[in-house]
UniProtKB/Swiss-Prot annotation:
Record comment regarding domains: The N-terminal domain has the RNA-binding Sm fold. It harbors the endoribonuclease activity.
Organism of this sequence: Thermofilum pendens (strain DSM 2475 / Hrk 5)
A Pfam family matched in the record: eRF1_1
Protein name per Swiss-Prot or TrEMBL: Protein pelota homolog
Lineage: Archaea, Thermoproteota, Thermoprotei, Thermofilales, Thermofilaceae
Quaternary state and interactors: Monomer.
Keywords: Cytoplasm, Endonuclease, Hydrolase, Metal-binding, Nuclease
Broad enzyme group: hydrolase
Gene3D superfamilies membership: 3.30.1330.30, eRF1 domain 2, Pelota, domain A
Localization in the cell: Cytoplasm
Superkingdom of the source species: Archaea
């Protein structure tokens, strides 16, 4: 989540949803009575002598006083429903009900009814710390492109051209391409571009895949190699068109969630009394202030009956700087969590 602005006096926060997990934090931020501003579509009403007619749907920027928050799993969007408090006059929307949908890549402004309190700041800090960066290197026959893959797209930083060494059938692919590619890749890492990234992904065409793998091994670079039909700058955009960017980004986070679930389950099975399972048990230890790590299924967070209970637990764990993981129910981590009531907590000390 990227926070674009924070106005303490007005209780305003403006942000961009960067990853799917940010929707969980946004869900925690917005309460009934808060006003959410965002882009949506609204049908025009046209007054004629014969009466009122419905016109086309147009994009408009609206403010909605939230009465209900829901999550649409199919579209992976949060839905904020309530009365419109601010809208362009031409759409005649003020006072009527409307739903603003927010998904990955969307920009939204929230005006908190109760102001920017410590709980809100804590959520924003933790959400901002979840940003993951992927360094993307795309190797083509005549150029190497370098960029950063983010949840809302790709930022190409440089495109470096090169010429293969030697010519003719007597020269192997390795002899012609290994040295120039190795030189460029080495410069990328020496320049510091790989610092503060969570993963390095190298895109390369089928023809040069073996050469590039050998280069990475010789340079000691740990990277995931993804095959594309064409490398270079075109290869980067091929990744985006093919929908692989989402997989690359989610893979940075999901193994961590799975590892945490397995680790806390192991602690639970050890019988040492330093872990509990099930929402009811988690509520108790959260109230006592002894939760070190909390893992909750998104099914509990978005559930009508369990939402308020989960929000209370999250608030208690947030306030004591505990680690929190919210996992999708359909993920491998979520499936392992389900038999234990969708909630696990690792404790600072044993209950035995």
């Amino acid at each position: 989540m990227r926070v674009l602005g924070l106005n303490q006096e007005r209780g305003e926060v403006e942000l961009v949803v960067e990853v799917l997990e940010d929707l969980y934090y946004l869900f925690l931020l917005v309460r009934k009575g808060d006003v959410v501003y965002g882009w949506t579509t609204r049908q025009l009403r046209i007054e004629r002598a014969t009466g009122e007619e419905r016109g086309e749907r147009i994009p408009v920027y609206l403010g909605v006083e939230v009465e209900k928050v829901s999550y649409a799993k199919f579209s992976e969007k949060l839905r904020f429903t309530g009365r419109v408090v601010e809208a362009p006059e031409e759409v005649y929307a003020k006072g009527s009900f409307h739903t603003i949908q927010v998904g990955v890549g969307d920009r939204v402004k929230i005006v908190k009814k109760s102001g920017i309190d410590g709980f809100t700041r804590n959520i924003l800090e933790k959400a901002a710390s979840k940003i993951r960066r992927v360094l993307l290197i795309s190797v083509g026959d005549e150029e190497v492109a370098v960029g950063y893959l983010s949840p809302v797209g790709v930022e190409v930083r440089a495109v470096v051209g090169y010429s293969p060494v030697g010519r003719g059938k007597e020269s192997s692919l390795d002899e012609r391409y290994r040295e120039p590619i190795a030189s460029i890749v080495q410069r990328i890492f020496e320049s510091g571009r790989a610092e503060h990234v969570d993963e390095v992904v190298v895109a390369v065409n089928e023809r040069l895949a073996e050469v590039v793998s050998r280069v990475l091994g010789e340079l000691g670079v740990k990277a995931r190699v993804v095959k594309v039909s064409e490398g270079g700058e075109a290869g980067i955009y091929e990744l985006l068109r093919g929908g692989q960017s989402r997989e690359l980004l989610s893979s940075v986070r999901l193994p961590l969630e799975l590892a945490e679930v397995e680790r806390v389950l192991q602690e639970l099975f050890s019988g040492k009394g330093k872990a509990v399972a099930g929402l009811e048990n988690v509520e108790k230890v959260a109230e006592w202030g002894i939760v070190k790590t909390l893992i909750v299924s998104d099914a509990l967070l978005f559930g009508e009956e369990s939402r308020e209970r989960v929000l209370k637990v999250l608030g208690e764990v947030f306030s004591r700087n505990g680690k929190i993981f919210i996992v999708p129910e359909e993920s491998e981590a979520g499936r392992k969590l389900k038999p234990f009531g969708g909630a696990l907590a690792e404790l600072y000390y044993s209950l035995e």
